Amino acid sequence: MPLVNTIHHSAFIYNQLKKLNLCKFYPNRVINHLISILISIFISGYHGKTTDFAKNSSCHRTTIAHFLNSGKWDDSLLSDTLKRSVIEIIYSEAARTGKPVFCIVDDTIASKTKPSSRALHPIEDAYFHQSHLKGKQDYGHQAVAVMLSCNGIVLNYAFVMYNKSISKIDIVENIAKELPVPPVMSYFLCDCWYTSEKIINTFAGRGFHTIGALKTNRMLYPFGFKKKLNEFAALLSTTRSHFHLVTVKKQKYYVYRYEGNLNGIENAVVLLSYPEKAFGNPKALQAFLSTDVSLSVDETLSYYAGRWILFF
């Protein structure tokens, strides 16, 4: 990055940190390290290594590594300040426009090379995790990311490393508990990992309905009879007459709307969905839950599709 651009971006970042009053709480050495790290993250060629940070700092990379690993500064102050700022921006936009707040949750794995069994210094907090993208165990760091969104504004609220000391369900539940009640009807968007009774109820207590993917072996109770979701879909898909063709982001899907009980959920909507060209294919079946039964099929799928404005 040219020097003039570095100076420009440094001044901009410094002013933003100043607006958050962080310059009052952190000494200059901490602010300078943060500015160097932030500039490095947003320039081309960033690889997530301390050597990248050193390129935009007057300090050696070992000094920056020491700051990150052992530096005497309260990183929770930075995290809490950023969270308050994100809440203020997103909730103010919701109050101004009447548009819903979306709390979007997902997790990802930063893959690392598996260390030798004789390695003296294996990568800290790296474990084997089940990768849904690769369909197998993957070695690396896993993190849970939480975004808040309203009216096209999308901001990172939290990024929590998962080190198996606390479950991902508990991580998300703790985040739900700390969120203020939004000024309008709002929604928690997630994949099937997080559509648990525990999380749904916690978000409901904070003013958020849940819209999320469901595993196809979840139990439904159509017409009062207990039936696995995929078995119920197989019965319905003998004919297209039970389904409605809808369009989401220029893609067409056959969708059946179920409203009723699930285990642990008294009343919700479940959408059974097949791509137009894969109708009746069990491997193409997808299911989505909405605890807001007032939403139309199109609204539910449109809201859920909004989670893919995401970050990975």
Regions found by a protein language model. Give the residues of each.
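Single, function-defining residue in the core of a domain
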Residues: 1-22, 26, 30, 34, ...
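Gly/serine-rich nucleotide phosphate-binding loop at the start of the catalytic core
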Residues: 1-78, 83
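Short N-terminal helix-initiation segments at or just after the protein's N-terminus
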Residues: 36-51, 84-91, 128-136, 230-234
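A common structural microfeature
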Residues: 38, 50, 61, 99-104, ...
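Residue-level signal for secondary-structure boundary elements
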Residues: 50, 76, 94, 309-312
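A residue-level signal for conserved active-site and pocket-lining positions in enzyme catalytic cores
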Residues: 53, 146, 210
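Active-site-proximal, Lys/Arg-enriched surface segment
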Residues: 70-151, 252
